[in-house]
């Protein structure tokens, strides 16, 4: 059942440098009238329209976010015995800020379709510029993190 329509809205987090028009998408809330009662967006924006070279977020520019990511790594390491050479994976790794908090003797891997512009931050880490899927990371990791990413996944 329709609840609220805000019409077509510009996609957030996208900063066009060339003055071109930012893509827009419908922003309509609907309510499941079945047993679930879920309030959700009616439409999903293709992930390639949001994440890529024009995605503008950078984890490292916000001190609160840097502190939070440091805490996430501290908590993960307190639960898992990380040994030299163990693989740690950050899905949606952005500029590599979270991975910077692991010791340099860990094999630090970031996967992010928007991270090509941050390649310099990954000199001592592995970067896979793509969306996460089994085919581009068939290995096992000792610790896997993903911050503020799952709400962008449709299924």
Predicted segments — roles?
Residues 83-94:
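Conserved class I S-adenosyl-L-methionine
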Residues 114-116:
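Conserved SAM/SAH-binding beta-strand->alpha-helix loop
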Residues 142-145:
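A conserved beta-strand element that flanks and buttresses the S-adenosyl-L-methionine
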Residues 1-63:
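N-terminal juxtadomain amphipathic helix
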Residues 95-105:
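Conserved SAM-binding loop of SAM-dependent methyltransferases across substrates and taxa
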Residues 152-155:
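A short, conserved alpha-helix within the catalytic core of class I
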Residues 107-112:
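Conserved SAM-binding motif I beta-strand of class I
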Residues 121-137:
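Conserved SAM-binding strand-loop segment of SAM-dependent methyltransferases
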């Amino acid at each position: 059942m329709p609840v609220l329509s805000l019409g077509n809205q510009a996609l957030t987090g996208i900063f066009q440098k060339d003055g071109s028009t930012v893509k827009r998408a419908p922003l309509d809330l609907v309510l499941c009238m079945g047993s679930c009662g879920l309030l959700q967006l009616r439409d999903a924006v293709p992930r390639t329209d949001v994440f890529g070279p024009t995605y503008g977020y950078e984890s490292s520019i916000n001190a609160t976010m840097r502190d939070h990511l440091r805490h996430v790594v501290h908590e993960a390491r307190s639960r898992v015995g990380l040994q030299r050479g163990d693989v740690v994976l950050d899905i949606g790794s952005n500029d590599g800020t979270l991975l910077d908090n692991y010791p340099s003797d860990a094999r630090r891997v970031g996967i992010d379709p928007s991270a090509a512009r941050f390649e310099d931050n990954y000199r001592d880490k592995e970067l896979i510029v793509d969306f996460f899927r089994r085919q581009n990371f068939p290995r096992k990791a000792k610790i896997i993190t993903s911050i503020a990413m799952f709400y962008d996944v449709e299924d």
